Amino acid sequence: MNKRGKLTINLIRNEESTMNKNGKKLGIFSFLLFLLTALFTLASGNASAEETTPAVSVTGKFADTITIVNVSNNEGGDLNWDLEQWATFRINATYDLAGKNVKAGDQTTVTVPEALIITSSSFEIRDINTNEIIAHATVDAENKKLTLTYTDYVEKHSDTNGSFFFYARIDFKKHPQQGEIPVVVTVNGVTKVAGKVTFKGIGDGNPRTLTKTSWVNNTDYKTVSYTISVNRNRQNIKEVTLEDHLKFTSASYVKDSIKVIKGKFAYVDGEWQFSDRVDVTDQHKITIAEDGQSFVIDLGDITEADQYRISYDVRLNYQPVDGELLKNDATLKGKGVVIKEITNASAVQIAGGAGIGYVFTINVHKVDDANQPIKGAKFKVVREANKQVIGEYETDENGNITVNALLKDKYILTETEAPAGYVIKDADTVVNVEDFGTD
């Protein structure tokens, strides 16, 4: 006889573990879903700021409002690893306008050291409750400077305070060597120590048969551009095909954006350069799958003298959020060679006064009617926004599954296979955005 049970969902924040939501009966087993929010505060970086001079009051149009500056990884946590050449990190800051007599048009400037580059675009700092603009943050990448220009919001509200962050990376042309880099920012001419980062150095570029890079358009964040570099290490391969497959479904390839360019690769001053370019797109067969989620390019036989760069764009049909990773695969196949497969994750990085990162967790606990753990139940977790499969999981001997690195978004938990002696009645369990809480 197949067993039946109950599905109980309790939503608990890790800051206040005594809070819960009334369980709802959905059918067959008992689950305990813990939605753990870990909203990073700006004090959780590698090092808090240390002022080299005392705080200064407002003088003219410059408002000295920054109280703390620190560095963190892209998700807001500790940056405890060495940075690669193009790797980014966050610079976080808190500000407090209390007692500063700040007026509309007053400014605060933040300048990063010569060894860094600001990679964020300009953004706005807003009131988290009313969405009113508190300040415009303008990025001057060439001069390594970010300027806050305050609006009349600051004259209509008292004791305004908050936080913001932006992304940066190592300027490897000015600092190519391996080693530790102090992150000392200048705020209105006053230096503040934000912490330090360690750079791996530019190295030899790691020439490979297949390399894939991507970046997100920083205008609307809905267009992702990809480049695939083929044969940087100068191999001879017969009957070469290149396959690309999107791992998120709420998106499609931009029509006519796929280009095949032939040229020559060279690693110069820390960057791969591609010269002597010739567009050979019309010389190669390109097949796009009926579902629009993959394509295949027939490159034919390649010699050590044949090097290619394939480029294309993908358009999302939803609005991504800061911290989101957009993954897709590329595979190179050839006669008598090992398949070269790479997975590329393009990170959405939107600077602002608040951020959402991969800091949420779903814990599933499965028990029978006697409240004993059940091993071997299989589940699939899908993010609703882009239909991306987060992963497939199986309960352990304690009846537990842990799904880490989630955005604060809607997810569908689908039971795909029940253990022996049990049946699936209601396969899907929905986790909504509001279930995670607002902390």
Regions found by a protein language model. Name each.
Residues 4, 9-439:
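Solvent-exposed loop/turn and edge beta-strand elements of beta-rich ligand-binding domains
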